[in-house]
């Protein structure tokens, strides 16, 4: 008889739940819930389990916030809960709550070539460290290492490191944003709002008045080539995305590859392919030859968070990935 576990990927707007086959990691019966329709994560889980009528005793939920203790408070929603209390309330034998990019990193060993698009480099070295990052509402970062036949995710808040300007143009951008924001993190550039920040800073650095644009406006005008400032912003976004990925590669020697997740890049994929992304990734001065063979992949799987939550849980239960 097939045994299932509950897996989830929860953000500020949507909570996506699914079943994961414990033996092989297959994800099925995924369903997306609006977080605005429920008072708590537990209420969403109960609604889902009531529909599926499965005997579930194990769960793993990925959430877009730091996970440091039993008590979890979402940063982009008002849900807060005790993991141990939720586990008891649901009568689960185990319940894991992990960071969303911990889940994405754990998906890497489960991905097939059909769910990856390569941008330069050669082939990934087996069992070598991996880096994962992605721009969306924020900038998520994680690393993955292989130790004693187990994959270990190294989560953190790498999206909040300082933005490092590396050209005269970027110096001007940093000057404008520092005046507005004080501390300028990488996430202030590499995110949906970051794209708007880039556009605004480009215009203001030229002593002009920017329009009140949304991220989608900047992207659409850039792709339609109807706004030079928007096109410059999107081009700079791709370059800085490459440079940031190259920094991650240097940090841990990620010869297992650097993987891009998140919802922004697929919206302008052809533009991204033709951009200065890969050149910026390799632009490491004396260490250009070091990073040159490291492959970069865009994850195209529909549910990497669910896949990774399942992988994390299965490994916790003793399965070898």
UniProtKB/Swiss-Prot annotation:
Keyword field contains Lipid metabolism: no
Main location: cytoplasm
Record: residues binding ATP: 8-13
The keyword Cytoplasm appears for this protein: yes
InterPro entries for the chain: ATPase_NBD, Bacterial_glucokinase, Glucokinase
Superkingdom: Bacteria
Alphabetical GO biological process terms: glycolytic process
Protein name: Glucokinase
Organism: Erwinia tasmaniensis (strain DSM 17950 / CFBP 7177 / CIP 109463 / NCPPB 4357 / Et1/99)
């Amino acid at each position: 008889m097939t045994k299932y576990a509950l897996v989830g990927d929860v953000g500020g707007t949507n909570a996506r739940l699914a079943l994961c086959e414990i033996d092989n990691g297959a994800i099925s019966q995924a369903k997306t819930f609006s977080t605005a329709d429920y008072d708590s994560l537990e209420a969403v889980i109960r609604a889902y389990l009531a529909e599926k009528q499965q005997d579930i005793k194990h769960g793993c939920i990925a959430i877009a916030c730091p996970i440091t203790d039993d008590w979890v408070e979402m940063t982009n929603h008002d849900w807060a809960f005790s993991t141990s209390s939720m586990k008891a309330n649901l009568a689960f034998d185990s319940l894991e709550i992990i960071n969303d990019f911990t889940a994405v990193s754990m998906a890497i060993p489960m991905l097939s070539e059909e769910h990856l698009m390569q941008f330069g480099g050669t082939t990934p070295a087996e069992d070598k460290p991996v880096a994962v990052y992605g721009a969306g509402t924020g900038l998520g970062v994680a690393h993955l290492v292989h130790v004693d036949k187990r994959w270990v995710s190294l989560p953190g808040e790498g999206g909040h490191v300082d933005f490092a300007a590396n050209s005269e143009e970027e110096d001007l951008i940093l000057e404008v944003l520092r005046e507005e924001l004080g501390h300028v993190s990488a996430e202030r550039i590499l995110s949906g709002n970051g794209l708007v920040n880039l556009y605004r800073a480009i215009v203001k650095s030229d002593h002009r008045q920017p329009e009140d644009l949304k991220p989608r406006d900047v992207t659409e005008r850039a792709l339609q080539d109807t706004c030079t400032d928007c096109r410059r912003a999107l081009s700079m976004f791709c370059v800085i995305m490459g440079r940031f990925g190259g920094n991650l590669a240097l940090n841990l020697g990620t010869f297992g590859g650097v993987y891009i997740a998140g919802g922004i890049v697929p919206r302008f994929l052809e533009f991204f392919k033709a951009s200065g992304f890969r050149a910026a990734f390799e632009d490491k001065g004396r260490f250009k030859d070091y990073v040159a063979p490291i492959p970069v992949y865009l994850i195209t799987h529909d549910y990497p968070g669910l896949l990774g939550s399942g992988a994390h849980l299965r490994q916790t239960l003793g399965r070898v990935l």
